[in-house]
Amino acid sequence: MNVIRARTAGFCMGVSLALRKLDREVDRAEEKAAQGSPRCRIATFGPIIHNPQVLEAYAGMGVRCLRQVDEVEAGDHVVIRAHGVPQQQEKALRSRDAVVVDATCPKVKKAQLGIEEQCRAGRTLLLFGEAEHPEVRGLLSYAGEGALVFGSVDELEGLPLQPETEYFLAAQTTQDRVAFEAARAWLHERLGHEVPVLETICDATRLRQQEAIDIARKVDAMVVVGGFDSGNTRRLADVAAAQGVFTVHVENESQLPVEQLRGCGIIGLTAGASTPKSIIDATQRFLESL
């Protein structure tokens, strides 16, 4: 079996940075314990990234995943997830007498601050994203009242837009660029003028999606590896499938539909921004063995 592997597959800068920050806290805690000091409790606030194998590995190291601010105890070392958190939660965390380490992706942090600046200037946010995604909840916390979220042009068409309101358009950092541009064009037609755009889709997302499209057009099937909770991985599968090729999204090689793939001559392989290289490697080896 021939496999074309995407060069962009695997950890993005934001994920790598977040994991390095968490690793640093784990290492420091172990060093202190080795010196006879009490081992401080290490935790993340929410899953550090959306990958089950990575989360399981950290749990094995004693890293807890906290969901509520009142779970944080004095002296804890708490690492904020790569997706960011609502600013009210961040303020509450910092009031708990704990050591708080912000591992928010720099691209997400830039989007948060850009949204805040636009809203302070009197504009209202139209946000293209998944309403229940943790990154989106964080972004909305910087937008004030009146912000609207939509996940597709169909949803955008159903929003109660007011002609007299000065809107601006932004997106979840891992959203589909083509769909975002379609929303932008629809707004121009609907409102009769160009809506200001805050460019928040990161380059890594754009390049990863474009490479997935390019590979999907050359192969008999496409395999996308990454957590089922990972929005950017789901969108990779979507853009690949949109090219008309059989596409499967799996978390690891054990979930591959072997019989459906066995007859393929060439298979494309890509992975989400939170998928470890070891899992991508294992999936590639398995595919090549078919």
Curated annotation (Swiss-Prot):
Top-level division of the source organism's lineage: Bacteria
Chemical reaction(s) catalysed: isopentenyl diphosphate + 2 oxidized [2Fe-2S]-[ferredoxin] + H2O = (2E)-4-hydroxy-3-methylbut-2-enyl diphosphate + 2 reduced [2Fe-2S]-[ferredoxin] + 2 H(+); dimethylallyl diphosphate + 2 oxidized [2Fe-2S]-[ferredoxin] + H2O = (2E)-4-hydroxy-3-methylbut-2-enyl diphosphate + 2 reduced [2Fe-2S]-[ferredoxin] + 2 H(+)
Protein family according to the UniProt entry: Belongs to the IspH family.
Free-text comment on the cofactor: Binds 1 [4Fe-4S] cluster per subunit.
One Pfam family this sequence matches: LYTB
The gene coding this protein: ispH
Protein task: Catalyzes the conversion of 1-hydroxy-2-methyl-2-(E)-butenyl 4-diphosphate (HMBPP) into a mixture of isopentenyl diphosphate (IPP) and dimethylallyl diphosphate (DMAPP). Acts in the terminal step of the DOXP/MEP pathway for isoprenoid precursor biosynthesis.
HAMAP family in alphabetical order: IspH
Positions bound to dimethylallyl diphosphate: H50, H83, H133, S230, N232, S274
Keywords linked to the UniProt accession: 4Fe-4S, Iron, Iron-sulfur, Isoprene biosynthesis, Metal-binding, Oxidoreductase
Residues noted as binding (2E)-4-hydroxy-3-methylbut-2-enyl diphosphate in the record, renumbered to the chain: H50, H83, H133, T173, S230, N232, S274
Pathway assigned to this chain's UniProt record: Isoprenoid biosynthesis; dimethylallyl diphosphate biosynthesis; dimethylallyl diphosphate from (2E)-4-hydroxy-3-methylbutenyl diphosphate: step 1/1; Isoprenoid biosynthesis; isopentenyl diphosphate biosynthesis via DXP pathway; isopentenyl diphosphate from 1-deoxy-D-xylulose 5-phosphate: step 6/6
UniProt protein name: 4-hydroxy-3-methylbut-2-enyl diphosphate reductase
Binding-site residues, isopentenyl diphosphate: H50, H83, H133, S230, N232, S274
